A protein has these predicted regions:
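Sec-dependent signal peptide recognition
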Residues: 1-8
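Beta-propeller domains with acidic blade repeats across secreted/periplasmic ectodomains
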Residues: 2, 13-205
């Protein structure tokens, strides 16, 4: 048990946190001013860095809270045969997720830190809340993270329905729930596993 605890601690220490991003509100406001839109529409800034980063997909719940899939693993732990051509022949033979993991192990010495490269960064789900009704998110928190196993791809899709948050991050379709209402997912279940068998997948998951 002691050695297992030490292994977990070592694994956690190797995980790099998402970068701290500079305030992006001013830049976003300037960008909004250049939008071409129907004059009947209004575009206003709801959230910008550092309250969120690298947003890929969003979903709203019944309380108008915004859940954001944030992507930090692009080309950092998620590999493909277009940028890693030495994968190509092995990748064409892959039939299972276990085959892809074996391929990563075979070529691990080509990556900084070996197999640690594939689990050093994590994608996450951010929760944005406008609690005062002012039209901007003044509260931001991490709803769920830990999507950084070697086979994990990118947190690329999110759907929120009746308190359930569905997240696509290959090889899994995840169900996330906040059962105690503290704004963090305390329940996580893989509803289906098996997506993204091959490495040539970036941009298609």
């Amino acid at each position: 048990m002691r050695s297992l605890a030490a292994l977990v601690l070592l694994f956690c220490d190797a995980l790099e946190p998402p970068p701290t991003l500079p305030d992006g509100a001013e830049e976003a406001t300037r960008a909004i001013a250049t939008f071409r839109k129907d004059p009947r529409l209004t575009v206003e800034l709801f959230a910008a860095e550092p309250r969120l980063g690298n947003p890929v997909a969003i979903g709203l719940d019944e309380r108008n809270r915004v859940f954001v899939a944030e992507e930090y693993r692009f080309n950092r732990g998620t590999e493909e045969n277009r940028t890693r051509p030495f994968f190509l022949e092995d990748d064409l033979r892959i039939r299972t997720l276990e085959d892809r993991l074996a391929m990563y192990r075979k070529f691990a010495d080509r990556f900084e830190g070996g197999m640690d490269w594939f689990s050093r960064w994590t994608d996450q789900v951010r929760l944005l809340e406008d609690r005062d009704g002012g039209g901007r998110a003044e509260v931001a928190s991490v709803f769920a993270d830990g999507f950084h196993q070697p086979l994990d791809g990118l947190a690329a899709g999110i759907l929120v329905r009746e308190g359930d948050v569905y997240l696509t991050c290959i090889p899994n379709l995840w169900l996330l729930r906040d059962r105690d209402g503290d704004g963090k997912a305390d329940f996580r279940e893989s509803l289906h596993r098996g997506f993204g068998v091959n490495a040539g997948f970036l941009g298609h998951d």
